[in-house]
């Protein structure tokens, strides 16, 4: 029993380090803003001009950009946006998704602002500041509420 108690801390540390190593994503690496595709840099400077790029992570097939105002933008390898997520209670700017989405929100949701938007195969998944999730097709036509 004494031998077991003697080796227990070492065993515990070994297991914890193994779990930590498995949890780390070796594919993500920090890169400079200059290494982003041109279309991603243009997107950030056009729609988020007042924020600075805080950190850029590169994976094999995508980029994740963290802005100084807390907004996170995911881009594919070509630099096209995939997901734009603002901090809680912060509204995203308009203009980078179909105008029909804004038209629907003005008419049916009292103009509620968008907190997160992502591109999906069917179109767009939108989370409003009110917490309501909506789905739109690729043209911006409302499909349904998302549970």
Mark where each language-model region is.
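Sec-dependent N-terminal signal peptides of Gram-positive bacterial secreted proteins and lipoproteins
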Residues: 12-17
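First exposed extracellular module after export/assembly in secreted or surface-exposed proteins
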Residues: 2, 31-147
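C-terminal motif of bacterial Sec signal peptides marking the signal peptidase cleavage site
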Residues: 18-23
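Bacterial N-terminal signal peptides that target proteins for export
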Residues: 1-11
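Bacterial signal peptide processing site
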Residues: 25-28
């Amino acid at each position: 029993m004494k031998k077991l108690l003697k080796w227990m801390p070492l065993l515990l540390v070994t297991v914890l380090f193994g779990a930590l190593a498995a949890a780390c994503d070796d594919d993500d690496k920090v890169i400079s803003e200059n290494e982003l595709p041109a279309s991603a840099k243009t997107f950030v400077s056009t729609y988020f001009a007042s924020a600075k790029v805080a950190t850029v992570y590169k994976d094999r097939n995508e980029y994740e950009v963290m802005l100084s105002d807390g907004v996170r933008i995911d881009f594919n390898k070509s630099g096209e946006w995939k997901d734009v997520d603002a901090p809680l209670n912060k509204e995203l700017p308009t203009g980078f998704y179909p105008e029909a989405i804004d038209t629907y929100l003005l008419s049916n949701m009292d103009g509620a602002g968008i907190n997160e938007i992502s591109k999906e195969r069917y179109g767009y998944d939108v989370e409003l500041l009110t917490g309501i999730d909506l789905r739109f097709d690729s043209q911006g036509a409302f499909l349904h509420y998302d549970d």
